[in-house]
């Protein structure tokens, strides 16, 4: 994950001081891209320990179309707590948009099922896209989508994916985002009998919060270790039937975890 450390250093070297919605302050750059060949290993940051349980359960939660944190709490995942209301609801965030995007005539579009059908039946399409950025429902969401738009691409029997992330918390959020979408590519590829290709991450406002600087320098002082390998133990009937127990990360030997405050 040398690319991740290079991005951190780039933000430190070239970033502009900006104010932000949370009032914390950031160093920010605009427009950055990283490419991860998923054949080379699973792109899980090794210069600090990442909480894999949270990454997997959050993705499974998205895929169920869920927008209440009850499932996450049942599985000891607290990453959405700060934004939930007193009933645990977040409004029409990722899961709702992925699985039940509302249309003007009262229907709902299941974007995940749609792209799966496209990958199986029309893999050369340039429209294999999922969007979470529903401008008609942004004001109802506890947090507007940061990872907003992703596209799949099939070539030579391999499935690749590019994500556009409009806002990126490089220290806390980005390691989760990279691993989550890499996991999704593996799952979609398995369901479509494809090999994995590249995960391409594209960032808009790409920033380090002012209260993450010490933690950033600590990570930059550490040498990246070899990437682990993802093992999916079974092939479920559908993309929606995976369970936490289906995934194993082999050979993950990270440096110790590094804590940092969340900007809300």
UniProtKB/Swiss-Prot annotation:
GO MF annotations in UniProt: thymidylate synthase activity
HAMAP family for this protein: Thymidy_synth_bact
Name of this chain's protein: Thymidylate synthase
Any Gene Ontology biological process: methylation
Binding residues for dUMP: 21, 126-127, 166-169, 177, 207-209
Pfam family name, one: Thymidylat_synt
Keywords, in A-Z order: Cytoplasm, Methyltransferase, Nucleotide biosynthesis, Transferase
Catalytic reactions of this protein: dUMP + (6R)-5,10-methylene-5,6,7,8-tetrahydrofolate = 7,8-dihydrofolate + dTMP
Class of the enzyme per the UniProt entry, highest EC level: transferase
Family: Belongs to the thymidylate synthase family. Bacterial-type ThyA subfamily.
Subunit structure as annotated in this protein's UniProt entry: Homodimer.
Coiled coil, from the record: none
Pathway it works in: Pyrimidine metabolism; dTTP biosynthesis
